[in-house]
């Protein structure tokens, strides 16, 4: 896999109350590029964070409709990847 693509696949970890509860089950969420596949996401997490990935689930989050100065607009769609790592391994999202 192209090294540059690996570095650009993961955009940021998602830190929320729901994701904090899921981290007890070895699941973590990341905002990823829209054109990333599950194989690319798995490879990027394993290379960059040094953990073994068991499963990757992806979903598209639709952008919200917003009104700004009387005009209707929308925020862009984005892709979320939920990654399950092997038992006993953790990802420190504060460090990433």
Curated annotation (Swiss-Prot):
Domain of life per record:
Bacteria
Against Pfam families, the record matches this protein to: Ribosomal_L23
> Cellular component GO terms, alphabetically?
ribonucleoprotein complex; ribosome
Q: Per its UniProt record, what InterPro entries does this chain match? A: Nucleotide-bd_a/b_plait_sf, Ribosomal_uL23-like, Ribosomal_uL23/eL15/eS24_sf
The entry lists its GO molecular-function terms as:
rRNA binding; structural constituent of ribosome
GO terms of biological process kind: translation
Kindly state which keywords UniProt assigns to this record, in alphabetical order: Ribonucleoprotein, Ribosomal protein, RNA-binding, rRNA-binding
Instruction: State the Gene3D superfamilies in the record.
Output: 3.30.70.330
Q: Do the record's keywords include RNA-binding?
A: yes
Give the record's subunit note: Part of the 50S ribosomal subunit. Contacts protein L29, and trigger factor when it is bound to the ribosome.
Describe the function of this protein.
One of the early assembly proteins it binds 23S rRNA. One of the proteins that surrounds the polypeptide exit tunnel on the outside of the ribosome. Forms the main docking site for trigger factor binding to the ribosome.
Q: Which family is annotated?
A: Belongs to the universal ribosomal protein uL23 family.
Q: What is this protein called?
A: Large ribosomal subunit protein uL23
Specify the species: Vesicomyosocius okutanii subsp. Calyptogena okutanii (strain HA)
